[in-house]
Amino acid sequence: MPLTLKQEDQVNVSLQSLPRHVAIIMDGNRRWHQQHQTQCTLKQTSGHYYGAKALPSIIESAFSLGIEVLTLFAFSTENFLRSTEEVEELFSLFHSQLDEQFPYLIENKIRLRCIGNLSALPLQLQQKISEISLKTHQNSHRDLVLAINYGGKDELVRAFKKLHQDLVEQKISSDSISEELIRLYLDTSEMPDPDLLIRTGGEMRVSNFLLWQIAYTELYVTDILWPDFKPNHFLDAIKAYQHRSRRGGR
């Protein structure tokens, strides 16, 4: 499907002051399931299925509007503590969503990137991620970033281990360590920090997501549960962002 967004939906959105990078914590799937149990069949044992159905319209809306990078918090390191059934269901949904979104990524020249400790994922899912990442790697103007088995603390630990190894091997010196150098060891080294972080579901926390990167990010929290999050809600977040004055900590 080509990149389209109805003009009437863009009312009061300035295309000159868009966030370059938007990140989303897609929260509320399980609460949605509890509220809509009569709609959930035995096969779809949680709201994750319905959360996955919300993805395409938000992805399309973001890139149609002109967002360059969209990062989605799909699966945290802590999510492995959930039931085996739920974890397996999530991995199955990831695999099917990658297949479904692949033609859209190709048609609209969007690159897939994945961040997190991917080595702990099922081999079949790792292979699917590698396949689509390779086939879209030349699409350099828009990035869809999936955070899978991702935790901000885990990312920093992995980064510092790599930095320490380079110190031991004398590839870098201790005097060269700076914010800029540390950034090069992060999963997100090749992308800008988020300008806007959207969290659905109403919880007022960042849940170990992009801890280094969101130091100066604008936060937008909505009570809308993720399966109910629609393009108009996404645009509400963009409008709210555009009414803020970013000071970068100053």
UniProtKB/Swiss-Prot annotation:
One of its GO terms (molecular function) is ditrans,polycis-polyprenyl diphosphate synthase [(2E,6E)-farnesyl diphosphate specific] activity. The active site is at residues 27, 79. Substrate binds at residues 28-32, 48, 76-78, 80, 82, 199, 205-207. The keyword ATP-binding does not apply. Its cofactor is Mg(2+). Mg(2+) binds at residues 27, 218. Keywords: Magnesium, Metal-binding, Transferase. GO terms for biological process: polyprenol biosynthetic process. NCBIfam families: PRK14840.1, uppS. Catalyzes the condensation of isopentenyl diphosphate (IPP) with allylic pyrophosphates generating different type of terpenoids. Belongs to the UPP synthase family. Homodimer. PANTHER family: DEHYDRODOLICHYL DIPHOSPHATE SYNTHASE 2 (PTHR10291:SF0), DEHYDRODOLICHYL DIPHOSPHATE SYNTHASE FAMILY MEMBER (PTHR10291). This is Isoprenyl transferase. The lineage of its organism: Bacteria, Pseudomonadati, Chlamydiota, Chlamydiia, Chlamydiales.
